[in-house]
Amino acid sequence: MSGLGIMVLTLLLLVFMETSHQDAGEKQAMQRDAINVRRRRSITRRVSEACEESCEDEEKHCCHENNGVYTCLRYCWG
């Protein structure tokens, strides 16, 4: 095999080794993100049907109900 062929094979080997290290880092990051997603809790809101129905007209969610006053928002936080 010529010197040029050996250099090309060496270069390909180095490129392969570098890309495999990068993939391992991405895999670790994906696993870490998956663990964080599993730890999150979902908040279940309990409001009356009247509140839900009044907010449906505005295409929003009933986030809070206080003495018959409904808080309708696109997204409920906290």
UniProtKB/Swiss-Prot annotation:
<dbReference type="GO" id="GO:0008200">
    <property type="term" value="F:ion channel inhibitor activity"/>
</dbReference>
<feature type="disulfide bond">
    <location>
        <begin position="55"/>
        <end position="72"/>
    </location>
</feature>
<keyword id="KW-0027">Amidation</keyword>
<keyword id="KW-0800">Toxin</keyword>
<keyword id="KW-0165">Cleavage on pair of basic residues</keyword>
<feature type="disulfide bond">
    <location>
        <begin position="51"/>
        <end position="63"/>
    </location>
</feature>
<feature type="signal peptide">
    <location>
        <begin position="1"/>
        <end position="19"/>
    </location>
</feature>
<dbReference type="GO" id="GO:0005576">
    <property type="term" value="C:extracellular region"/>
</dbReference>
<keyword id="KW-0964">Secreted</keyword>
<keyword id="KW-0732">Signal</keyword>
<protein>
    <recommendedName>
        <fullName>Conotoxin PnMSGL-01</fullName>
    </recommendedName>
</protein>
<feature type="modified residue" description="Tryptophan amide">
    <location>
        <position position="77"/>
    </location>
</feature>
<comment type="similarity">
    <text>Belongs to the conotoxin O3 superfamily.</text>
</comment>
<keyword id="KW-0528">Neurotoxin</keyword>
<feature type="propeptide">
    <location>
        <begin position="20"/>
        <end position="44"/>
    </location>
</feature>
<keyword id="KW-1015">Disulfide bond</keyword>
<dbReference type="Pfam" id="PF02950">
    <property type="entry name" value="Conotoxin"/>
</dbReference>
<feature type="disulfide bond">
    <location>
        <begin position="62"/>
        <end position="76"/>
    </location>
</feature>
<dbReference type="InterPro" id="IPR004214">
    <property type="entry name" value="Conotoxin"/>
</dbReference>
<keyword id="KW-0960">Knottin</keyword>
<dbReference type="GO" id="GO:0090729">
    <property type="term" value="F:toxin activity"/>
</dbReference>
